[in-house]
UniProtKB/Swiss-Prot annotation:
This is E3 ubiquitin-protein ligase UBR2. Keywords: Acetylation, Chromosome, Coiled coil, Isopeptide bond, Metal-binding, Nucleus, Phosphoprotein, Transferase, Ubl conjugation, Ubl conjugation pathway, Zinc, Zinc-finger. The modification N-acetylalanine is found at A2. Zn(2+) 2 binds at C112, C115, H133, H136.
Length: 1755
């Protein structure tokens, strides 16, 4: 098919490329009917350029479209070559003072909390950095795409509207000039023509609905039968459904289907098939059939290719228009005129209207293109922004209706543009007054919530999924209303008043439909069967909370509006209460000679609703009357006399009683829906406009009525009237007959009622209720939150109510009430309450939940005990009420109140006769305290002529009336003071009596004689001193008692030791032996310790006893006993890698014998240090395996460990492990017990001997491999072969280990091989020993790096688990050859040896530059016993070790010299060169000679010696660790201290001369020839000639990448990152690899790749190439660190970025500026260096099971 198309397509291209834009434009300039000309041109050319085949070629299409279609338009517009025309236009244009940058997805945006008018006012990064706001309290978020930078918009900022860049452009914007003055008449006319035609064309073709014919003026003569099957996006179907359907319908691979689905999701549509009509129709029917089962089917259309072509070009044109108008404001103005010009069809016929009204029919891509155009044109031209806003408002209802029917998110709907108009204060006011916008929004909202009950209230019963979906969409209207109200008017016009009040009426209608919705009735007898729907109503309430507050703020800003609004609200409340007394019979209540009429109503029997927005709004307005003093200025205008207090309090009181009854457990059978409703009613998100307002409404009612009447009504509603109105009710009640439940219930109700009274009198911190301001209110909230416990900033913010701007006002007051404590390495910064604020603590603070109240009480009492104060928590001193609420305090001294208090105290005095509770008494005491504080304040503030009418002290001193003669309240308190059963409340009662006396004294003293008062204080003082002395005495007694007890205990201990002397003697000996094993305490401090060689320090072998963690049995570690093992974890590692791009192509054929110095991938072993018997471990592992198989049959979930890969959790510490290391005695001591001669060979002799032995072995090896028929010849050859003296190649040493130990040696060896090479286990494979030695070497190198990086001494105190792991690993590696084939190990030794001492049989060996010398050393030393065991000539193993070590050290020195950097640092030493420097210079000259002078010029000896010392240090340290663990020689004490470099000490410990070059001098004869052979290697030559690289020494430590100090620069970097697979599209989840700095696109289909036959996400794939399976990433949009290991393991980790309050912000929800915390970043780096990432993930997954369910491999 393709080949047929090719020539034809090329021909088309040729004809297109021959078009001349200039000629076409010239033709258009002459044309009489320009529209027809342009349309004909487009009809002819567009289908030839776009949509030529199944797959689009965007680059080619764009190039041709520019040449053939857009070029002529640009020529026509400019009247000349656009390359000159546009720059001229640009020059004539004045730069804009508006920034207007449209945000990309994920770009950082900044808002200033001090200056922004509302949170939608944001700046782009560039403007922000150049603005004054960077030093303010700013918020940083990532944009969801769309939206503008508001720099330059004076209405958006209270100050600093311009950044430095845009301020330069503000000089001449005094008066708004017409931008067209800068353009010539011709240009204006031509622009007008071309814009009108192209804009109309684009709108027409994009809104075209026919699928196979074009508009008449675009139809072609000959039409091909080519169609597209076009799939459209919807938000209903999932990715998986779409992918599956496409695979079936168009027969494509999964990868192609994913590609299609990704494009559909991104652009809104994609063709999935190209061909004739029938072919496409068939695919369509399959798609529709497959997706219509559960939901509506996917939208698919079969469209003619020419229509798709024109639509694609239509989009291109809109983008083109957007870029053209960027050249000049004049062009922008013309485009706006064209767009908003009414067409011939009148209303809604302008192009802009047509596009807006077709919005929901357009696909995603088309929408975003035209929204973009509107933003860069209409919204950037202030004159037309206004006109556009009017069109938007006129079409508002229709647009919202379309949005409700649409299923796309609001972000891609034109309705989302509302934020651009409604938040601009002048535009919003204009729309309210001219277009009645407020009423329109609310009415549109009401239209969509049609379900009502018989009373006309909203009914959300049993929402279907679709209704719930619609309801979610309807909520966006509330957001629009919030935008309109967000900035309060500073001045009011009459029209604004009128229209606002019309809107307020509409709002009251909305609230009226909510008043009393979702009513509930108490379930009696049986539990409710179906949980009623409650969420929708609360969602509505939550969304409206801010709107209700803002409505009140608007009312408060104008007195006339406030009065009118109050009247309207009252009228609506009267309507709601229309049937308030109907059908409910009146009753009369009387207590203490007061009586009141009310209705019979029981909350526990009738319907009751928690939703009372109208009452609550009235309460809010009533407080505003008080706050703004309107109530006192214009009482005649207010209907205050018409108010019926009983009616006002009725519904809020019912609501509070409902809460009390729920708490008393009376509504248990109503299920969770009610519990949830009560929770949200009090919750910080809703309480401001629910619970708080109910309290205010009750305060309002009480302040207007006789408090006795109120209390009686309240008792009646609480269903407690009987108890307090009949004197002996309590006695009867407590007799045996009654139900315990009922007693408990009534007690709780009494407690709740008393709590309510405390609230009504005590809660006066709302401005308008009490004489306070807003900051007092916030301070009080914070004090009470911090009195529970110290809190982090974010916790505090969560517990405070936010206003519409997401502000709590906390920052302005927090310094006054709290201290800030900075965080450590983990945790967060905390605020602690200042001690002086504790006195403001109110135990019955109304925003405490039950749990918080008890915590706060506990905390405050504890604090008082610590400060040696009494533990009473008296009520705090309160601010006075505002005049409107002043009469509220009288409730405390009303007769009914005193009766209630008296009754409860009476119960407490006769505590056995009645049912009462301590909580009840505690509340009564609190109320008495409040009354006393109140009276005290009245007396303190009294003026001459006033009499204090508050006489609580007198009333509580009076005993009861005649017949009963009950004692006075005061008398009862004095009785209770000494009651033993009220220990807890003693302090409080004492405080009350003390305060009572003080108040009494104040009453008695007239204003002229204040003497009595001072006496009172003196008396108080003396009593306080007494208290103090008493406490001191008690403390002293307690101290003496403690000392006596301690003395007795130590005497008993001594006695016990004396009696059991011999027992202690044994344990002490044992302790000494175990500590010797642990601490390697030096044997003799004065002798030199040597780790290897014939002079090795001989250490007596300590016996080692260990205990199995599984069976608790103790056992000695011996050669012949059962194996003991350590749990271990082996993993591949690139932590030390200097080359991450290396990859083993074919692990089956790879030979790991030589490790390259770049350490590209090593095998690391770690252990938690816990010991088990091998057989116990085997049993444990089998049970884990069996359990896992059972679990897999039940659940297809991953666990934190992968049993199939041999993983398990350590039974003790749950540390992830995948194998076990056997515990062994030092293996060298076992094999080294042969006779050793005293004269050992020197290096030269030893090398010759070894070379001969190797030759013999190779000869025999050859013999064995030759076929038998040549046997006669062979025997001659054997004679010919002179075996070196004492060498017996046929000897096989006896292996001393028990079977169990051998098995474990094999187990661990195989595990290392399997993990290290990523192959299947095979214990016979010759590479197993190599991998064991490699793991030992690599692990030691890792530890050495960690110690060096942290400047810790080499043999300082290592953590136990590390020490055990290194010891066991080294001993294992040294013993492993015993279970491998001797000849294989010998073969490895020969090859390793040949890399340093060349022989003829090994040709292809790496050159000296390409061998890591420490790996080579470990390999040679550990393979050597396989050769040495056949040598009976008396050469000891130690000699071999020493010579190998010296040889490798010399090779390493040569490596260092060859690669040393010879740039001089200008630091030449003045002194004469020392011995080392001369020696190293001589050696360098030798090298210079052997390399044929290719080596660089000879630097100074000082410089060379410094290079050698620095370069060899890591090697020496690793060697010291290795030989220390291999031979068990303790480390010299000098190396155990931090500080100096320890070079000399290391040399001495390792049997090296301090002047390392002496090694060369002592063995010069053999060394010179070896050096020559090393330098002759062609690779060395290539390196010296600059043709290749080599590693330099010392290797630098790898670090994680450098992160920027400020997090926003990371966000910015990530927002510029395009997904590599989706054609320049911004990535949705940019993720930064912290190891190498690559940015990846994670968590989306686009970047999945295949790894080992499975689909994996970009991060997982990257971990394999960069971290050999382990990855550390930072998810930039979430500010979250991601750890990955393998394909199934991962966890999230706390990021290293903190805000100013020491907290992380995962998910960037709070938006506080974040800065890098270096310590936390170091901690992550340390985890990486220590290879602990996998362990960290394991622990996290065990601790949090939700992590196991995450699909890590697709991240």
């Amino acid at each position: 098919m393709a080949s047929e198309l090719e020539p034809e397509v090329q021909a088309i291209d040729r004809s297109l490329l021959e078009c001349s834009a200039e000629e076409i434009a010239g033709k258009w300039l002459q044309a009489t009917d320009l529209t027809r000309e342009v349309y004909q041109h487009l009809a002819h050319y567009v289908p030839k350029i776009y949509c030529r085949g199944p797959n689009p070629f965007p680059q080619k299409e764009d190039m041709l479209a520019q040449h053939v279609l857009l070029g002529p338009m640009e020529w026509y517009l400019c009247g000349e070559d656009p390359a000159f025309g546009f720059p001229k236009l640009e020059q004539a244009n004045k730069p804009s003072h508006l920034c207007g940058r449209v945000f990309k997805v994920g770009e950082p945006t900044y808002s200033c909390r001090d200056c922004a008018v509302d949170p939608t006012c944001v700046l782009c990064m560039e403007c922000f950095l150049g603005s004054i706001h960077r030093d303010h309290r700013y918020r940083m978020t990532t944009s969801g795409g769309g939206g503008f930078c508001d720099c330059g918009d004076t209405e958006a900022w209270k100050e600093g509207p311009y950044c430095q860049k845009h301020e330069l452009n503000t000089s001449e914007i005094e008066e708004e000039e017409d931008p067209l003055v800068h353009l010539s008449e011709d240009v204006i006319a031509r622009t007008y023509n071309i814009f009108a035609i192209t804009f109309r064309y684009a709108v027409e073709i994009l809104t075209w609905e026919k699928e196979s014919e074009l508009p008449a003026d675009l139809e072609m003569v000959e039409k091909s039968d080519t169609y597209y099957c076009m799939l459209f996006n919807d938000e209903v179907h999932t990715y998986e459904q779409v992918i599956y359907t496409l695979q079936k319908a168009v027969n494509c691979t999964q990868k192609e289907a994913i590609g299609f689905a990704t494009t559909v999701d991104r652009d809104g549509r994609r063709s999935v098939r190209y061909g004739d009509f029938q072919y496409c129709e068939q695919a369509k029917s399959v798609i529709v059939r497959n997706t219509s089962r559960q939901t509506k089917p996917l939208k698919v259309q079969v469209m003619h290719s020419s229509i798709v072509a024109h639509q694609n070009f239509g989009l291109k044109l809109l983008s083109w228009l957007g870029s053209i108008i960027g050249y000049s404001d004049g062009l922008r103005r013309i485009l706006c005129q064209v767009g908003l010009q009414e067409g011939p069809d009148g209303e809604n016929s302008s192009l802009v209207d047509r596009l807006m009204l077709s919005d929901s029919k357009l696909w995603k891509g088309a929408r975003s293109v035209y929204h973009q155009l509107f933003m860069s044109s209409l919204l950037m031209d202030l004159k037309y922004k206004k006109l556009f806003a009017v069109r938007f408002a006129k079409n508002y209802q229709q647009l919202q209706r379309d949005f409700m029917e649409d299923d796309h998110e609001r972000a891609v709907s034109v309705t989302a543009l509302s934020v651009q108009f409604f938040t601009a204060p002048t535009l919003a006011r204009m729309l309210i007054t001219e277009e009645n916008l407020m009423s329109i929004i609310i009415k549109t909202f009401m239209d969509h919530l049609r379900h009502r009950d018989a009373q006309g209230r909203f009914q959300f019963e049993r929402y279907t999924a679709l209704q719930a979906f619609k309801f979610r969409r309807v909520q966006s209207l509330i957001l629009d209303l919030k935008y309109v109200l967000i900035s309060k008017p500073t001045e009011w016009s009459d029209e604004l008043r009128q229209k606002f009040l019309e809107g307020f009426d509409a709002f009251l209608e909305l609230l009226k439909c909510m008043q009393g919705m979702d009513p509930i009735t108490r379930q009696v007898g049986q539990h409710i069967e179906m949980e009623p729907e409650w969420e929708a109503a609360f969602t509505l309430q939550m969304k409206l909370t801010h709107v209700i507050s803002m409505m009140q703020d608007w009312c408060a800003s104008d007195e006339k509006v406030l009065i009118e609004a109050y009247k309207k609200c009252l009228a609506v409340l009267m309507q709601c209460h229309g049937g308030y007394t109907d059908g409910e019979q009146p009753i009369t209540l009387s207590i203490c000679g007061h009586s009141v009429e009310t209705i019979r109503y029981c909350v526990s029997q009738e319907k009751v609703s928690i939703h009372l927005p109208v009452s609550r709004l009235l309460a809010g307005l009533h407080v505003l009357l008080s706050k703004s003093e309107v109530a006192y200025k214009f009482p005649e205008l207010l209907p205050l006399s018409e108010l019926s207090p009983p009616m006002l309090i009725e519904h809020p009181l019912r609501c509070l009683v409902l809460c009390a009854q729920v708490h008393a457990g009376m509504w248990r059978r109503n299920g969770f829906s009610l519990v949830n409703q009560i929770y949200y009613y009090h919750n910080v998100k809703c309480r401001r406009e629910m619970f708080d307002k109910d309290v205010v409404m009750l305060q309002t009612g009480v302040s207007m009525m006789d408090p006795n009447h109120f209390l009686m009504i309240m008792l009646s509603r609480f269903e407690l009237y009987q108890i307090f109105s009949t004197p002996d009710y309590g006695k009867r009640f407590s007799s045996e007959i009654t139900h315990k439940d009922v007693v408990q219930q009534n007690n709780t109700l009494i407690e709740e009622m008393l709590y309510l009274i405390i609230m009504l009198v005590g809660e006066r911190f709302s401005p308008g209720v009490g004489q306070v301001n807003a900051t007092d209110e916030i301070k009080r909230e914070i004090i009470h939150q911090l009195s529970i416990k110290p809190m982090a900033h974010s916790e505090l913010v969560k517990s405070l109510p936010e206003d519409e701007n997401k502000e709590t006002g906390m920052e302005s007051v927090i310094e006054a009430v709290a201290h800030f404590k900075k965080p450590g390495l983990t945790g967060r910064g905390m605020y602690e309450l200042k001690p002086e604020c504790a006195k403001e603590f109110n135990l019955y603070f109304y925003h405490f939940s039950r749990a918080e109240q008890s915590k706060a009480e506990e905390a405050q009492r504890k604090l008082k005990r610590q400060n040696r104060e009494d533990t009473a928590l008296p009520p705090p001193v309160l601010p006075p009420f505002c005049p409107l609420f002043a009469s509220l305090v009288n409730i405390l001294q009303s007769d009914v109140m005193l009766c209630i208090m008296g009754t409860i105290l009476q119960w407490a005095v006769e505590h056995n006769g009645y049912a009462w509770s301590e909580s009840m008494l505690q509340r009564v005491l609190h109320l008495i305290g409040m009354a006393l504080q109140e009276e005290k304040q009245h007396l303190e503030n009294v003026t001459e002529e006033h009499v204090v009418t508050f006489t609580f002290t007198q009333k509580i001193s009076k005993p009861g009336e005649a017949p009963k003669n009950s004692p006075s309240i005061l008398a009862m308190l004095e009785t209770l003071q000494n009651a033993p059963y009220l220990e807890v409340h003693k302090d409080m009662i004492r405080w009350i009596l003390k305060t009572f006396n003080a108040v009494k004294k104040m009453r008695e003293s007239s204003p002229t004689s204040p003497v009595a008062e001072t006496e009172g204080t003196i008396m108080e003082e003396s009593s306080r001193d007494k208290d103090k002395a008493e406490r001191k005495r008690k403390a002293e007694i307690a101290r003496l008692r403690r000392e006596k007890i301690m003395a007795q205990m130590s005497e008993m201990q001594r006695h016990f030791i004396d009696e059991n002397k011999e027992l202690f003697q044994q344990t002490l000996e044992l302790d000494a032996s175990t500590s010797a094993v642990l601490d390697h305490s030096p044997v003799a401090s004065d002798m030199t310790l040597t780790a290897l060689g014939p002079a090795q320090t001989q250490v007596p072998e300590q016996r080692q006893f260990v205990t199995c963690i599984l069976c608790q049995e103790e056992q000695e570690v011996k050669v012949e006993s059962r194996a003991m093992v350590l749990a271990a974890f082996v993993q591949r590692s690139t932590v030390l890698s200097k080359n991450r791009s290396k990859f083993i192509q074919d692990p089956e054929k790879y030979d790991p014998l030589f490790m390259h110095p770049d350490l590209s991938c090593g095998t690391h072993t770690s252990s938690c240090g816990h010991i088990m018997h091998a057989h116990c471990w085997q049993r444990y592992f089998d049970s884990v395996q069996a359990k896992e198989q059972r679990r897999q049959q039940r659940l297809r979930l991953h666990t934190s460990y992968d049993v199939e890969n041999g993983e398990f959790l350590c039974p003790l510490c749950e540390c992830l492990s995948n194998t076990v290391i056997p515990l062994l005695l030092p293996p060298r001591n076992i094999f080294n017990n042969r006779l050793n001669f005293s004269d050992q060979p020197n290096l030269t002799q030893w090398i010759r001997t070894i070379s001969q032995q190797i030759k013999a072995l190779q000869f025999l090896r050859k013999e064995e491999s030759t076929p038998n028929n040549a046997s006669t010849k062979n025997s001659e050859n054997v004679d010919e072969l002179q075996l070196p003296e004492g060498f017996r190649p046929d000897f096989r040493p006896k292996i001393p280990y028990s079977e169990s130990i051998k098995e474990m040696l094999t187990t661990f060896g195989t595990a290392t091989y399997k993990v290290g090479l990523k192959v299947h286990p095979n214990e016979e494979d010759p590479r197993v020993p190599i991998m064991c030695w490699g793991s030992c070497a690599y692990t030691i190198q890792s530890i050495e790096r960690i110690l060096s990086d942290e400047d810790k001494p080499l043999f300082g105190p290592l953590p136990c688990r590390l020490d055990d792991c290194l010891r066991s690993l080294t001993r294992f590696a040294a013993a492993h050859w015993t279970v491998a084939s001797v000849s294989v190990v010998q073969g490895h030794f020969c090859k390793l040896f040949a890399s340093l001492v060349p022989n003829d049989s090994h040709e292809e060996l790496p050159c000296i530059l390409d061998i890591d010398m420490f790996h080579l050393l470990v390999g040679l030393v550990l393979a050597f016993p396989a050769l040495q065991c056949q040598d009976f000539s008396g050469i000891s193993l130690g000699t071999g070790d020493l010579h190998i070590f010296h040889l490798v050290t010399m090779a390493h020195i040569i490596q260092i010299l060859l690669t040393s950097c010879t740039e001089e640092n200008g630091m030449d030493q003045e002194n004469p060169p020392c011995e080392e420097e001369s020696a190293v210079l001589a050696l360098y000259k030798t090298l210079h000679q052997y390399t044929g002078s290719a080596l660089k010029e000879i630097p100074s000896g000082w410089h060379l010696w410094r290079s050698v010392r620095a370069g060899i240090m890591p090697f020496l340290k690793c060697s010291a660790l290795f030989f220390h663990y291999l031979n068990g020689v303790p480390s010299p004490p000098d190396i155990q201290v931090p500080g100096t470099s320890h070079f000399e000490h290391l040399c001495s410990y390792l049997s090296l001369p301090n002047n390392l070059i002496c090694l060369f001098q002592e063995n010069s004869e053999i060394m010179n020839s070896l050096i020559e052979s090393w330098c002759r290697n062609s690779e060395v030559k290539r390196y010296l000639e600059g043709e290749r690289d080599a590693i330099r020494y010392p290797r630098e430590s790898n670090k994680l990448i450098n992160l920027p100090e400020d997090y926003s620069s990371l966000i910015n970097q990530a927002s510029n990152f395009s997904c590599p697979k989706s054609g320049g599209d911004k990535s949705r989840a940019p993720t930064l690899c912290l190891v190498c700095g690559s940015l990846l696109c994670s968590q989306s289909y686009c970047c999945q790749t295949e790894l080992e036959g499975e689909d994996v996400g970009a991060c997982t794939a990257h971990t394999y190439s960069c971290g050999s399976g382990v990855g550390i990433f930072l998810r930039v949009r979430e500010c979250q660190v991601l750890f990955l290991a393998g394909k199934t393991k991962g966890c999230f980790y706390s990021p290293p970025y903190l805000d100013d309050y020491g907290e992380t912000d995962q998910g960037l929800r709070r938006g506080n500026p974040l800065h890098l915390c270096k310590e936390r970043f170091k901690k992550i780096q340390k985890l990486w260096h220590q290879h602990s990432v996998t362990e960290e993930i394991g622990h996290a997954q065990e601790a949090n099971q939700t992590l196991v369910g995450i699909d890590w491999q697709h991240l």
